[in-house]
Amino acid sequence: MKLIVGMTGATGAPLGVALLQALREMPNVETHLVMSKWAKTTIELETPYSARDVAALADFSHNPADQAATISSGSFRTDGMIVIPCSMKTLAGIRAGYADGLVGRAADVVLKEGRKLVLVPREMPLSTIHLENMLALSRMGVAMVPPMPAFYNHPETVDDIVHHVVARVLDQFGLEHPYARRWQGLPQARNFSQENE
């Protein structure tokens, strides 16, 4: 499997790093990373890693200004793309087909080729413009996976929350996260079922 990972300047850099770390442990997945200029700044602000450290997690790291990169062409076959975190600027550009950098161009290619595109939008609160852009992309078949925490799994650390979001992103491609803590139903519901068998 070949996956493109785009990281933009929205807050949420730990999500992108954790995704790349998880994919690094999957020998059957080849990763192509594109970090925008502001993604690199955000990585160094929000994580203990440098942009170079993060680039080393991917099999291939592309210059965000290189419109001649392999992933800018539909003839270069991939299984899809994840933009994590996805800024509202990037999301709006993808909706409009405005590919001013490699993140936008790669997403545009994935869309036109009918491949899987997953966006992890990071903004709060959301304006009507943001919501309309997300709705339009959803109608095009784009998966919107906002990084909303779950509490049924009783997260104890920020990493627990990050791993849950990454697991839900990987679910979109049928990939299993080793730290996923999945919903098992309510204990009383299971007891009720057993008592009434």
UniProtKB/Swiss-Prot annotation:
EC number(s) stated in the UniProt entry for this protein: 2.5.1.129
Gene Ontology BP terms: catabolic process; response to toxic substance
SUPFAM superfamilies: Homo-oligomeric flavin-containing Cys decarboxylases, HFCD
Binding residues annotated for FMN, in chain numbering: G9, A10, T11, S36, S87, M88, K89, T90, R122
Keywords tagged on the record: Aromatic hydrocarbons catabolism, Detoxification, Flavoprotein, FMN, Prenyltransferase, Transferase
GO terms for MF: carboxy-lyase activity; flavin prenyltransferase activity
InterPro entries linked to this entry: Flavin_trans-like, Flavoprotein, UbiX-like, UbiX_pad_YclB
Reaction equation(s) it catalyzes: dimethylallyl phosphate + FMNH2 = prenylated FMNH2 + phosphate
Enzyme class, UniProt record, top EC level: transferase
Function: Involved in the non-oxidative decarboxylation and detoxification of phenolic derivatives under both aerobic and anaerobic conditions. Flavin prenyltransferase that catalyzes the synthesis of the prenylated FMN cofactor (prenyl-FMN) for phenolic acid decarboxylase.
Subunit structure of this chain's protein: Homododecamer.
HAMAP family xrefs: ubiX_pad (MF_01984), ubiX_pad_yclB (MF_01986)
Family: Belongs to the UbiX/PAD1 family. YclB subfamily.
Other information: It is not known, if phenolic acid decarboxylase forms a complex composed of EdcB, EdcC and EdcD. The term subunit is often used in reference to the operon, however there is no experimental evidence to prove the existence of the complex.
Annotated protein name in UniProt: Probable UbiX-like flavin prenyltransferase
Organism whose genome encodes this protein: Escherichia coli O157:H7
Gene designation per UniProt: ecdB
